[in-house]
Amino acid sequence: MGKVIGIDLGTTNSCFAVLEGGKPLVIENVEGGRTTPSIVAFTKEKERLVGQLAKRQAVTNAENTIYSIKRFIGRRWEDTEQERNRVSYHCVPGRDKTVDVKCWGKQYTPQELSAMILQTLKAGAEAYLNETVTEAVITVPAYFTDAQRQATKDAGTIAGLNVMRIINEPTAAALAFGLDKQEQREQVLVYDLGGGTLDVSILQLGDGVFEVKATAGNNHLGGDDFDNVIVEWMLSEFQAQEGINLNEDKMAMQRLREAAERAKIELSTRPTTSINLPFITAFSKGGGEVGPKHLKLNLSRAKFNELSRPLVEKTIDPLKQAIEDSGLSVDQIDRILLVGGSTRIPEVQEALKKFFNGKEPDRSINPDEAVALGAAIQGGVLGQEQEVEDLLLLVVIPLSLGIETLGEVFTKVIERNTTIPTSKSQVFSTASDGQTSVEIHVLQGERAMANDNKTLGKFLLTGIPAAPRGVPQIEVSFDIDVNGILKVSAEDKGTGREQGIVIKETGGLSQQEIERMQQEAEQYADEDRKRMQRIELSNQADSLFYSHEATLKDNQGLIPQKVKATANKKKEELMAILEDPNVELGVIQTRLEDYRQAVLSMGSEVYSQGSSKSSARDYETVGEEEMTRETGNSQESNAAFSTQPEGTVNNDNLELEAVFSTYNDHTQGSDVATSSHDEIDLGDASDNSQTNFDLDDEDFNPFEDFDEEEEASTDDYEAVE
């Protein structure tokens, strides 16, 4: 088994890490960032962008830039109205009344879109580790339902990952904080306020055991909500000043969202911030004239605290519930761990400090990275890394599970905060005489009545022999695995007839759908690879264009007209096919190689003409003995130039040396620019580039193709001698 990576698939940003030498290490993405925006975009050219690239173009492509998709994964259409009204992209009903996203005429499930983000993280891990990555541990909010967990696992499968474990984000964070403190027995509260969710978990750490005592949270409260209060304030202020409502302007709304996020971040360290958005909209002056409108506002931390106070107060309720469920008091909590970027908000920190009677939270680990680090540790456990074999993680379910019984009552089978994996059964019977079938309505929640809890699924057990009510014995079994995936079965003890269901209906995908999405994901990966190959070839062409022009400029009189004409023709052919987006890569490689050979021929002529002139000049001005000495110097210079092509050895070769030094400098520049794509197979073009211009090769000789000219020149010298 290779390395198991840990992935924090966040609402606004994602992070991935791996265990190296017993220590978790965050992996930087290809752009050098330690977190990757959880954003996917589709351009009008049908190009797919992920991460920072997608975020940069969000303002100009708001309707086709998908963010916060985690808020929709595994959820029903009717449960997401508030979230749907906040996004700029087009949401449509999906299968099983879930939420899909429509871009350029095609529908995407949240699983597919999440898989695109996971694919990007997977590629980054493979580039860092220099090996194929197939296993992962993915984190989810503690309050994620079974359907949301299953949908997240499906996303990993679509991305080509074997999701070995789905673990709760607060639990993962506790692993990151507690790795070096395993011998200390502590009661730890993890407060995880991310981009879209709030999770609170209380764990007992010690002796290598991480036991979750209680968990609570809010799946609809996070950093996005703090951004939204700033957006609403800006909308209100702008309408008051200008009388213009920006709500229907999607481009303006996207700019407001980005400005709100920046303002929120700045107010974590500054007392006030300025929000300047020039040309936010246009207005009619009358007579057909249109003029611009600018938004310029100042927001103080005090005002932000006032706007966000209701949100901060909402974060306290899960704290109270978790404390109560754990059976502990506030004073018995030894440590408070802050996780998630939104915990940087000063008002949130003050509220926590007040709730815990002045106890300072632990900020020793970057809150953006703690969850991914913990997931990497769990990955090390599952991957049997020796350094962490003694860790044991005991996770609990956040909400009770049960079925609907007579009178629409919710009867619990597994109580909340039960450690998983677990399996429990209860025996039920029929509610009326002669009843031959029963519907098993599986629910999740804490309310007494079935209608007040969340439906997970329904199935029918038929073929029950007719009997008086209360006589048939029907055993209902609940089985939850380590990932929190629930299986429910019902068996008639009299006949042995059994029926069951794996709870995955909310956003669940069939195996065929998952396979189809995997194929599409692979197709996109192939398209991405081809696009990078094309960019690499284009970069090589640009280097050749520059070298071509430099050689002509510095050595105009040394190159025959026929050779120049050939090189110019090859250049025009290459430029023409580079303009065609549909041309095959093989054609580009062929034209590039033809042009490269033409440029090399120019260099050959420069070398040949330069050597001839040098020989004639030396013969005229120096005696026979002096000519022999110059011949020796020329041979010595060539030998030195083979191993140190950029060094200056002989003044006679200085001009020639400068020409090829310029060429090689720019070829190297192209290699540096594409060094992050070492895995790309560029075929012959790449091979030729290495053959001709690998300056790190000790045997490198830029003139090895011109041995005949060198030998001829040397023979001439010997003849003179």
From Swiss-Prot:
Keywords in alphabetical order: ATP-binding, Chaperone, Nucleotide-binding, Phosphoprotein, Stress response
Residues covered by region (Disordered): 606-649, 667-721
Compositionally biased spans, kind Acidic residues: 694-721
Gene: dnaK
Known role: Acts as a chaperone.
Pfam families: HSP70
Domain of life: Bacteria
SUPFAM superfamilies reported for this sequence: Actin-like ATPase domain, Heat shock protein 70kD (HSP70), peptide-binding domain
Keyword NAD attached: no
Cystine pairings recorded for this chain: none
Name used for this protein in its record: Chaperone protein DnaK
Positions where Phosphothreonine occurs in the chain: 197
Amino acid composition bias (Polar residues), ranges on this chain: 630-649
Taxonomy of the source species: Bacteria, Bacillati, Cyanobacteriota, Cyanophyceae, Oscillatoriophycideae
Entry similarity comment: Belongs to the heat shock protein 70 family.
Induction: By stress conditions e.g. heat shock and by hyperosmotic environments.
GO molecular function, a single term: ATP binding
Species of provenance: Aphanothece halophytica
